[in-house]
Amino acid sequence: MRNRGFGRRELLVAMAMLVSVTGCARHASGARPASTTLPAGADLADRFAELERRYDARLGVYVPATGTTAAIEYRADERFAFCSTFKAPLVAAVLHQNPLTHLDKLITYTSDDIRSISPVAQQHVQTGMTIGQLCDAAIRYSDGTAANLLLADLGGPGGGTAAFTGYLRSLGDTVSRLDAEEPELNRDPPGDERDTTTPHAIALVLQQLVLGNALPPDKRALLTDWMARNTTGAKRIRAGFPADWKVIDKTGTGDYGRANDIAVVWSPTGVPYVVAVMSDRAGGGYDAEPREALLAEAATCVAGVLA
């Protein structure tokens, strides 16, 4: 990653991405048949329960209702650890709080600031990184140090975590909360409400950020582009949808077998849906292995309904 300013080219590319994934959705939204409805929830719930048994896991799923489809819900209002899914609304909070020129601000840091899973930040200790580069690293590579530096930049009287939670409250999310930075936020024991959200809450936040007006078009385009080029989600929601669906996402992984993914997906005709899939395997203890295949199979169930 070169240390250079956030230029017009990057913004134009991001705007092009936003048009490509949403333009056909606007065109198609009025053409969807009124008969497009979801099947009875019991059948899907049984399939999700079977996945829980097979993977020895707890699964949470939420797909918000659209004008012609009912919501898909399974443990949608149970709390799950954020893990790195918080980085998508974190970047949105930074974009919301500042003008686009803020993306060129250089942030310097030392080796003492490097945290686990920081593949990008650890390469730039000598040069520092711009806010724009930190946003890119936090979303596309789930870089923990980048996220902590963005939290510090977000600032506020109670610190970055309080400012982040406050941003969620401004979007109407009264459930989610962030209490710690990376990597501690991934380590809270089962049943602890710190650093948690629900599939329902995070899905509605993502809906506002990508499909709503929580961000102006230019900033929304940047967030959409970074999520579209995410490098960590190939085996999760993306794996569960057919190749002709467009998917943008942000993953999260943590202790106690936690594996999450939040996404916006577009059908081949351009119809958008928000999909949140969260999981943990607390019964396996602190070192339980996250199961990406569980998320992929849950996404396949969702895709089968939406298709």
UniProtKB/Swiss-Prot annotation:
Signal peptide: 1-34
Knockout mutant characteristics: Cells lacking this gene become significantly more susceptible (16- to 32-fold) to penicillins as well as third-generation cephalosporins and carbapenems. They have no detectable beta-lactamase activity.
Effect of K87A: 200000-fold decrease in catalytic efficiency with cefamandole as substrate
Superkingdom field: Bacteria
UniProt: substrate binding residues: S142, T251, G252, T253
Enzyme Commission (EC) number: 3.5.2.6
GO molecular-function term, one example from the UniProt record: beta-lactamase activity
Name under which the protein is recorded: Beta-lactamase
Species this chain originates from: Mycobacterium tuberculosis (strain ATCC 25618 / H37Rv)
